[in-house]
């Protein structure tokens, strides 16, 4: 009981400190026109991280592990297919979105 309360208090303190840090920084409010550029670059970095070389290598290892688990009987075929389908969706998302948006 007291451990849960102390965790909640620590969580609230951390959230308040992070909020104070973000609100107290004047650069966020100084130039609202360039703030979207910062958001765009952060989101682009996330997409690059999710579809980059390291992510592809991790996906290869995961597919191999799922295949071995399926052949050994530890993972059923449905869960293996969901894993492979999820990897395909993650790596196919940029192409799918650009196709739907009609990129020029």
UniProtKB/Swiss-Prot annotation:
Location(s) in or outside the cell: Cell outer membrane
Membrane topology: Multi-pass membrane protein
InterPro entries, per database record: TrbC/VirB2
GO CC terms in record: cell outer membrane
Name the UniProt record assigns to this protein: Type IV secretion system protein virB2
Source organism (scientific name): Bartonella quintana (strain Toulouse) (Rochalimaea quintana)
Family indicated by similarity: Belongs to the virB2 family.
Described purpose of this protein according to its UniProt entry: Component of the type IV secretion system VirB/VirD4 which could be a major virulence determinant for subversion of human endothelial cell (HEC) function. VirB2 seems to constitute the major pilus component.
Signal peptide: 1-29
Keywords: Cell outer membrane, Membrane, Signal, Transmembrane, Transmembrane helix, Transport, Virulence
Residues passing through the membrane, by range: 57-77, 81-101
Assembly: Homooligomer (Potential). Interacts with the 17 kDa antigen protein that is encoded within the VirB locus.
